[in-house]
């Protein structure tokens, strides 16, 4: 299996160039569902140790339906197939440039949740124009074991998020374990209370926000992912959901740019324009760097060919 690895603000992306499962034709949403239904062993073996690493997201290249798109892509982590991935789209774009498949300029990429526009400014810098993002619930309160009542918004930016501001725990690198435990407890309570999207879509991400000590930065975030890891980047789909909340509250004007910081200090530049359906069209600028190009082997006599699972699944 031929892969290229990159990181976007510290968050790794593995682009699968060849050797992945054949998913047939049809809409990318159907092919993504087929990947989730029939090929869980594939994406877990690619993402889990010893081949993968915590927080890595995979990007399986597929043929797009729309001929104007440079490629189709299905994102996944070790736990689930994702509708969209912002840091992964930045990493994918830089990877395609590294391969010589695209040059600086604007391109379209097809994802299971819609077509995303990317603008490659230089070898490492990409601006994404994401799908329309929206807030669907404001100030929903849940009782969380160990924390009491916690209030958050439910918003969609390509994935579903429960957004808590301010964070119940200071967002510092030294608090990552405590932040993760808190986010897991909150997500468990959110699911137990039946809180989800408009049609009951499950919340699989939790984001905490707080003010940043850096004067040029709007806020600092901690993003808890479906597989129990945390996002090293500010999270593209999470930032999109955040923009929808800020716009709905009247706290950020259309076209106004802010800087969003992750728990490790990496940043995105964010802005939005009004969307046609009452949401926002986010713009996210970040940087990615290619780290490795390699061939993955899956020998039948390897006891860990399907990855190392540290907890029962």
UniProtKB/Swiss-Prot annotation:
Stored Gene3D superfamilies: Diaminopimelate Epimerase, Chain A, domain 1
Single GO MF annotation: 4-hydroxyproline epimerase activity
Transmembrane segments: none
Keyword set, alphabetical order: Isomerase, Plasmid
EC primary class: isomerase
Short name of one Pfam family: Pro_racemase
Catalytic reactions of this protein: trans-4-hydroxy-L-proline = cis-4-hydroxy-D-proline
Chain residue ranges for the region called Disordered: 1-23
EC number: 5.1.1.8
Positions annotated to bind substrate: 86-87, 205, 231, 236-237
Active-site residues per Swiss-Prot or TrEMBL entry: 85 (proton acceptor), 235 (proton donor)
Top-rank taxon: Bacteria
Family per similarity comment: Belongs to the proline racemase family.
Function: Catalyzes the epimerization of trans-4-hydroxy-L-proline (t4LHyp) to cis-4-hydroxy-D-proline (c4DHyp). Is likely involved in a degradation pathway that converts t4LHyp to alpha-ketoglutarate. Displays no proline racemase activity.
Descriptive protein name: 4-hydroxyproline 2-epimerase
The organism of origin for this protein: Ruegeria pomeroyi (strain ATCC 700808 / DSM 15171 / DSS-3)
